[in-house]
Amino acid sequence: MDVKTTLDLSGKTVVITGASRGIGAETARRMAAAGARVIVNYHGSDAAADAVVGQIGERAVAMRADVADPQAVKKLMDDVVARFGTIDVLVNNAAVFEYNPFDADDYDAWQRGWRRTFDLNVFAAANAAWLAMRAMRRAGGGKIINVASRAAFRGETEFADYGASKAALVNLTRSIARGCAKDNIVASCVAPGFIETEMAKPELEAHREEIINQIPLRRVGSVGDVAGVILFLASPMGDYLNGGTIDINGGSWFQ
């Protein structure tokens, strides 16, 4: 088996949530370059999603859905299966990362932040995985790749809801790995540190020097640094990886 063959995703249908920008968009581009049919899920900008599809071409389809809504994510998955027959790879990438510190004074805002974060970062991923598994079982297997974070292990004092949600996602990955391998469904996680994305932009603008000082490689990661690992996990090269988490943080945190 040559290197080109090991990364070949020809004939595979890949669903990527939150794929109109950042890590999701770059992952979509790389999956399509490897031959996959890519569903670019998004909730915000039609123009951003259309731009990603335009860059990829005929291998990509944009599908709008708020995956934090249980009925919307069900319709998304049902529509993908109805149109393409199955789901071979699910990448749970959609997430929210909002300032919610312990010393804030607004209790209602604190609660809203936790609910909003868990609705998208945890419940949406769990629901999407549960729905995708149905198609994967019928097709003889599949892969679920969850995008967690360094925060799952390190903790975040001003984003505690985010860190807790990503820790839950890591555990969800392990549970899927243990419970679904019998159906040839495997699950893995990636845990990026700070990456140059729109979501991380406010923190990077405010604390870039401090953040870089934590990273032995002395740079913030790129979306390509993460997307390349996700492609590896989705490809035949990642077939025996199940339940683990790959750190992508330049050495700023070790499990």
Locations of regions flagged by a protein language model:
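Conserved glycine-rich cofactor-binding loop
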Residues: T13, S20-R21
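Conserved mid-core segment of classical short-chain dehydrogenase/reductases
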Residues: K74, V96-R115, R138, E158-D161, ...
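Amphipathic alpha-helical dimer-interface segment in Rossmann-like NAD(P)H-dependent oxidoreductases
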Residues: L120-R138, A177-R178, K182, S235
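Active-site helix of classical SDR
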Residues: A129, S165, T173
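Residue(s) in the substrate-gating loop at a strand-loop-helix junction
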Residues: S149
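Short, small/polar-rich loop/turn modules that mediate ligand/substrate recognition or access, typified
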Residues: A181, V186, L241-G243
